[in-house]
């Protein structure tokens, strides 16, 4: 969430910057609420001061042998009035907090202004799409012909947007995840983590999925008097980032770089009718996630580094891609700046997103109270948090199948994966 003090003091400027994201901040309502808050705050403080002053006079009256009943009655009356004002103030602060929770992050000044994805800006491109001398097949046809992608049984077992993988395809899927983890831990300096696939509401609030995006989640256990509800993770970003919730990290331990391979679960509530064929948009999919926790002055360079780490995966696999900086109107809710990496898919004759790398700055950290402190610092400061896919495993499998297909329907195994597949050079 945004800094409430900054939001109140820079209301007009904040509204202007949020408008570039297509978010309309109700300035008039917030201004009125802020005026009321100030008034209630002053009234509460004045009542508290009056009550304290009169309470002190009780002892003095007793010492003089005077009747303290009238003073006690006055203190009681002030106490009731004070409690009423405190209740009113608490309700107002709760309303202001709810508004703050619904406001997206401010775009960084380096982000291009635009309304939607059509105004994203390409920053670089790597590799040249292969020209095939035969009619290319898409990953669905390739995988089904090999006997490794079974959509029919997935529908029977669960429903649409699920997959059963078997044989050499399942092995390649596993090999891709292992390759990514090994690359990030041995060459990019990340620490591998194994994390829960179920998270509570505080965790989802911390990273920004709640309260705004609850419909995108698979909820497995509702909240009760005994505890919070639990939901399946939409991304390992949630458990990884929440490792520092309510924590003060020593500055010497920064940066913290974490990676994890997990299944991810998304209802795709807003994606009806999109990418209904194949593995591009599934309710359950695997992803290798990267998270960095850094000092504020280091976060923009960390975003460049993290994006580069995701790009190296594609380079080592020999998959052509382009990197886009998202415009203000296409960024995620909590992001201050995002790069999307899009891989070339021959069957679609276009680039498709395979990784999204974002700098959240202190947006998540403020929600989580994730802070750091140097040896000479008097007070802790908020961390900056970053996350990115390194990569989406299923979409990477799609890219390998389509880019490495042969005329006979077989798939050449990329050299980077052969050590993970027993030396196989082809499958199918």
Swiss-Prot record:
Pathway: Aminoacyl-tRNA biosynthesis; selenocysteinyl-tRNA(Sec) biosynthesis; L-seryl-tRNA(Sec) from L-serine and tRNA(Sec): step 1/1
Gene Ontology molecular function terms on file: ATP binding; serine-tRNA ligase activity
Cellular compartment(s): Cytoplasm
InterPro entries to which the protein is assigned, alphabetical: aa-tRNA-synt_IIb, aa-tRNA-synth_II, aa-tRNA-synth_II/BPL/LPL, Ser-tRNA-ligase_type_1, Ser-tRNA-synth_1_N, SerRS_1_N_sf, SerRS_core, tRNA-bd_arm
UniProt entry tagged with the keyword Nucleotide-binding: yes
Alphabetical list of PROSITE patterns matching this protein: AA_TRNA_LIGASE_II
Binding site for ATP: 266-268, 353-356
Enzyme Commission no: 6.1.1.11
Keyword line: Aminoacyl-tRNA synthetase, ATP-binding, Cytoplasm, Ligase, Nucleotide-binding, Protein biosynthesis
Cellular component annotations (GO), alphabetically ordered: cytoplasm
GO biological process: selenocysteine biosynthetic process; seryl-tRNA aminoacylation
UniProt-annotated binding residues for L-serine: 235-237, 289, 389
Catalyzed reactions: tRNA(Ser) + L-serine + ATP = L-seryl-tRNA(Ser) + AMP + diphosphate + H(+); tRNA(Sec) + L-serine + ATP = L-seryl-tRNA(Sec) + AMP + diphosphate + H(+)
CDD domains to which the protein is assigned, alphabetical: SerRS_core
Coiled coil: none
Leader peptide range in chain numbering: none
Main location group: cytoplasm
Family affiliation: Belongs to the class-II aminoacyl-tRNA synthetase family. Type-1 seryl-tRNA synthetase subfamily.
PANTHER family, per database record: SERINE--TRNA LIGASE, SERYL-TRNA SYNTHETASE
Subunit structure: Homodimer. The tRNA molecule binds across the dimer.
The protein's role, per its UniProt record: Catalyzes the attachment of serine to tRNA(Ser). Is also able to aminoacylate tRNA(Sec) with serine, to form the misacylated tRNA L-seryl-tRNA(Sec), which will be further converted into selenocysteinyl-tRNA(Sec).
Domain notes: Consists of two distinct domains, a catalytic core and a N-terminal extension that is involved in tRNA binding.
Name of the protein in its database record: Serine--tRNA ligase
Annotated organism of origin: Shewanella pealeana (strain ATCC 700345 / ANG-SQ1)
């Amino acid at each position: 969430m945004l800094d409430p003090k900054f939001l109140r003091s820079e209301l007009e400027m904040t509204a202007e910057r949020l408008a570039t994201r297509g978010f309309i901040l109700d300035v008039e309502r917030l201004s009125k609420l802020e005026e009321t808050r100030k008034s209630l705050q002053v009234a509460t403080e004045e009542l508290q001061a009056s009550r304290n002053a009169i309470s002190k006079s009780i002892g003095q009256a007793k010492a003089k042998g005077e009747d303290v009943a009238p003073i006690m009655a006055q203190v009681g009356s002030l106490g009731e009035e004070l409690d009423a004002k405190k209740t009113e103030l608490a309700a107002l602060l709760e309303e202001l907090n709810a508004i703050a929770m619904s406001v997206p992050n401010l775009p960084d000044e380096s982000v291009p202004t635009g309304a939607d994805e059509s105004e994203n800006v390409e920053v670089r491109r790597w590799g040249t799409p292969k020209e095939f001398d035969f009619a290319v097949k898409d990953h669905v046809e390739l995988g089904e012909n090999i006997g490794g992608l079974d959509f029919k049984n997935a529908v029977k077992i669960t429903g649409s947007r699920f997959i059963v993988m078997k044989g050499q395809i399942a092995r390649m899927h596993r090999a891709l995840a292992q390759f990514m983890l090994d690359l990030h831990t041995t060459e990019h300096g990340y620490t591998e983590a194994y994390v829960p696939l179920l998270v509570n509401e505080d965790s989802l609030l911390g990273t920004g999925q709640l309260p705004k995006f609850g419909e995108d989640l698979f909820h497995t256990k509702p909240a009760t008097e005994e505890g919070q509800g639990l939901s399946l993770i939409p991304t390992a970003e949630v458990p990884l980032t929440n490792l520092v919730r309510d924590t003060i990290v020593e500055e010497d331990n920064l940066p913290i770089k974490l990676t994890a391979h997990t299944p991810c679960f998304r209802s795709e509530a807003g994606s009806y009718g999109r990418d209904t064929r194949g593995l591009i948009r599934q309710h359950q999919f695997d992803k290798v996630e990267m998270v960095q926790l850094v000092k504020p002055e280091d976060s923009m360079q960390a975003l460049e580094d993290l994006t580069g780490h995701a790009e190296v995966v594609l380079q080592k696999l020999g998959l052509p891609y382009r990197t886009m900086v998202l415009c203000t109107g296409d960024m995620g809710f909590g992001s201050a700046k995002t790069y999307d990496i899009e891989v070339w898919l021959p069957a679609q004759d276009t680039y498709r997103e395979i990784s999204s790398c974002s700098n959240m700055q202190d947006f998540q950290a403020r929600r989580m109270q994730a802070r750091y402190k140097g040896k000479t610092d008097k007070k802790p400061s908020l961390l900056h948090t970053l996350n990115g896919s390194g990569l989406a495993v299923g979409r990477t499998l799609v890219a390998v199948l389509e880019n490495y297909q042969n005329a006979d329907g077989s798939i050449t195994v990329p050299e980077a994966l052969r050590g993970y597949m027993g030396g196989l050079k082809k499958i199918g």
